[in-house]
C-alpha cells in the first residue's frame, strides 16, 4: 500500500506546510484513533512533545482528532521520545504519540507513534493509517456525542520516567565523584535528564537547558558535540553527553575531549555484555551505516554484527526477530531491549557510565577498543528520488568505486527518509581514497538527480 505521509521515522515536515498542517494532523489522529479503537471500552492515548513552539498547534490538533474518535487523551508536556514509549506501556495506553522533528531545526516538526507495548508502528500499520487520512470522508463511523473522549494533563510523567531511568542502574552503582558535561539541545530532556544524573551522585555542568521555543538543536546537542567536547577538557570532566532535541540519541566525549559516535559506544557496551554472558548469541544489530570496523571488532571478539536498513525502528524489528537485546545506529540511537523498546539517549549514557564505574576505567581507555575506518558521508540535494539502479551514470560510478576498493571498503547510497537528499557514503582503511571516491560519486549523483 502506498504511504505518502510517513517517512523513516514518522511524519515530518516544515511547520504549517503539508503534511504538517493542523487539518492533516487532526485527520491523522482521527484515523489513528479509529484504527486503535477496539470495542466499547474506554481507550487511552498518551501525547508528548519536545520544546518547539509549534508543538502547541499539533498537541491540540491531535487531541481534537483522538477525542472525536472516542479516545481519552493524556498530555505529558515536554518529555523525551523514549519517555513516551515507556509511559505508553506504564499507563496501559492503546497508543503513544510524540510531537517532534528530533534533530531537525525548530521550523520543522513531526509526529511519531508507538503501539501499546511502546514499539514504533510497522510500515504496514502506518500505511493503513495514511490511507484513511488521504481518503478522509464524512461517513467515517465516529462515536455518538456520549462516547467522545476527554483530555487530561499527566502531571507526574517526568517523575515516572525519572524512576524508570534510575532503575536501569543497579543499586550498587552510583556516580559519586564523577563530573559530567550534559548538553540537552534546548530540547525535551532539559529538565528530567540533569535531575537523573544529579540524583545518582554526579556533578553536572549543564548546557542546552534553556528552551525558548525556537532554539532547539540550534548549534547544540548531538549534531554539534564539539561544544561538549571542548567543555569536558576545560572543566576536567569525566565525560560529555550530548543529546538531540527529543533525546532518543546520544553522542559522547571522553575526558580528553575526543568525540565517540554510536559505533564506538556500541563496541564498549557490546563487549561488556558479552563478557557478562548477557548478549544472546553474541549478536549486535546495527544499520548499513555502521563502520566496517565494528563488524571486524565483533568478529574478533567472538560475536557477529547483523545489519539492517537505516532507522532505529528497523534495528528494533530485527532485534525482536532474532532474539537480540542490544543494537543501535552510528548516529547515536542505542537500544537496550531489556530496558527500553526504542532508542534512549539518557538510558544509553547511564549504561555507558555504569561500565566506566564498574571497570574503574576512564572513557578514553574504553574507547581504544574500536578504531573506526576512515569514512566520509556527503549529503547531496536532489530534485527527484528514483532508484539509483535506474540512473546509468550513478550505477556505473558505483561499480567503478567498488572495483577500486576491491573488497577493502564499502560504498553506500541511500535517500533520506525525511529530506530531499541523497546520502553518499564511502569507507575504507585508506583515508585519501575515501575522500576522492566519495567526492567524485557525490558529483555524479548531483548531476544525475538535479
Curated annotation (Swiss-Prot):
CC terms in the record's Gene Ontology section: cytosol
Domain of life: Bacteria
Annotated GO biological process: carbohydrate metabolic process; peptidoglycan biosynthetic process; UDP-N-acetylglucosamine biosynthetic process
Cofactor note text: Binds 1 Mg(2+) ion per subunit.
Active site: 102 (phosphoserine intermediate)
Catalysed reaction equations from the record: alpha-D-glucosamine 1-phosphate = D-glucosamine 6-phosphate
EC number from the UniProt entry: 5.4.2.10
Pfam families per UniProt: PGM_PMM_I, PGM_PMM_II, PGM_PMM_III, PGM_PMM_IV
Residues binding Mg(2+), per UniProt: 102, 244, 246, 248
UniProt keyword Metal-binding, yes or no: yes
InterPro entries, alphabetized: A-D-PHexomutase_a/b/a-I (IPR005844), A-D-PHexomutase_a/b/a-I/II/III (IPR016055), A-D-PHexomutase_a/b/a-II (IPR005845), A-D-PHexomutase_a/b/a-III (IPR005846), A-D-PHexomutase_C (IPR005843), A-D-PHexomutase_C_sf (IPR036900), A-D-PHexomutase_CS (IPR016066), Alpha-D-phosphohexomutase_SF (IPR005841)
Modified residues (Phosphoserine): 102
Cofactors demanded by this protein: Mg(2+)
Transmembrane segments: none
Keywords from the named record: Isomerase, Magnesium, Metal-binding, Phosphoprotein
PTM per Swiss-Prot/TrEMBL: Activated by phosphorylation.
GO MF entry, a single one: magnesium ion binding
Assigned protein family: Belongs to the phosphohexose mutase family.
Role, per record: Catalyzes the conversion of glucosamine-6-phosphate to glucosamine-1-phosphate.
UniProt cross-references to NCBIfam families, sorted A to Z: glmM, PRK10887.1
Protein name: Phosphoglucosamine mutase
Organism: Solidesulfovibrio magneticus (strain ATCC 700980 / DSM 13731 / RS-1)
Amino acid at each position: 500500500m502506498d504511504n505518502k505521509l510517513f517517512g523513516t521515522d514518522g511524519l515530518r515536515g516544515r511547520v504549517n506546510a503539508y503534511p504538517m498542517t493542523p487539518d492533516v494532523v487532526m485527520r491523522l489522529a482521527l484515523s489513528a484513533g479509529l484504527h486503535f479503537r477496539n470495542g466499547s471500552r474506554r481507550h487511552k492515548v498518551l501525547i508528548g512533545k519536545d520544546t518547539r513552539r509549534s508543538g502547541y498547534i499539533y498537541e491540540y490538533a491531535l487531541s481534537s482528532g483522538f477525542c472525536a474518535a472516542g479516545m481519552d487523551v493524556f498530555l505529558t508536556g515536554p518529555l523525551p521520545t523514549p519517555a513516551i514509549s515507556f509511559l505508553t506501556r506504564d499507563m496501559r495506553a492503546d497508543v503513544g504519540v510524540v510531537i517532534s522533528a528530533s534533530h531537525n531545526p525548530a521550523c520543522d516538526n513531526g509526529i511519531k507513534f508507538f503501539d501499546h507495548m511502546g514499539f514504533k508502528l510497522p510500515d504496514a500499520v502506518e500505511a493503513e493509517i495514511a490511507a484513511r487520512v488521504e481518503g478522509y470522508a464524512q461517513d467515517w463511523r465516529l462515536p455518538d456525542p456520549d462516547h467522545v473522549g476527554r483530555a487530561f494533563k499527566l502531571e507526574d510523567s517526568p517523575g515516572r520516567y525519572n524512576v524508570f531511568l534510575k532503575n536501569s542502574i543497579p543499586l550498587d552503582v552510583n556516580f559519586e565523584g564523577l563530573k559530567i558535561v550534559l548538553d540537552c539541545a534546548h530540547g525535551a530532556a532539559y529538565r528530567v535528564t540533569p535531575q537523573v544524573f544529579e540524583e545518582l551522585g554526579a556533578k553536572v555542568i549543564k548546557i542546552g537547558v534553556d528552551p525558548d521555543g525556537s532554539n532547539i538543536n540550534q548549534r547544540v546537542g548531538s549534531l554539534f558535540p564539539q561544544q561538549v567536547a571542548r567543555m569536558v577538557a576545560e572543566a576536567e570532566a569525566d565525560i560529555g553527553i550530548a543529546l538531540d532535541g527529543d533525546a532518543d540519541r546520544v553522542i559522547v566525549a571522553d575526558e580528553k575531549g575526543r568525540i565517540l559516535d554510536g559505533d564506538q559506544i556500541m563496541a564498549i557496551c557490546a563487549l561488556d555484555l558479552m563478557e557478562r554472558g548477557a548478549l544472546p548469541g553474541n549478536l549486535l544489530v546495527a544499520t548499513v551505516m555502521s563502520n566496517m570496523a565494528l563488524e571486524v571488532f565483533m568478529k574478533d571478539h567472538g560475536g557477529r554484527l547483523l545489519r539492517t536498513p537505516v532507522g532505529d525502528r528497523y534495528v528494533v524489528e530485527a532485534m525482536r526477530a532474532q532474539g537480540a537485546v542490544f543494537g543501535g545506529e552510528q548516529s547515536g540511537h542505542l537500544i537496550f531491549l531489556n530496558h527500553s523498546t526504542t532508542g534512549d539517549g539518557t538510558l544509553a549514557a547511564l549504561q555507558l557510565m555504569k561500565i566506566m564505574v564498574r571497570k574503574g576505567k576512564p572513557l578514553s581507555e574504553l574507547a581504544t577498543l574500536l578504531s573506526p575506518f576512515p569514512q566520509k558521508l556527503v549529503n547531496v540535494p536532489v530534485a527527484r528520488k528514483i532508484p539509483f539502479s535506474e540512473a546509468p551514470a550513478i550505477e556505473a560510478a558505483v561499480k567503478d568505486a567498488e572495483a577500486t576498493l576491491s573488497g577493502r571498503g564499502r560504498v553506500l547510497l541511500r535517500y533520506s527518509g525525511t529530506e530531499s537528499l541523497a546520502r553518499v557514503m564511502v569507507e575504507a582503511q585508506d583515508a585519501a581514497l575515501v575522500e576522492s571516491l566519495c567526492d567524485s560519486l557525490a558529483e555524479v549523483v548531483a548531476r544525475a538527480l538535479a
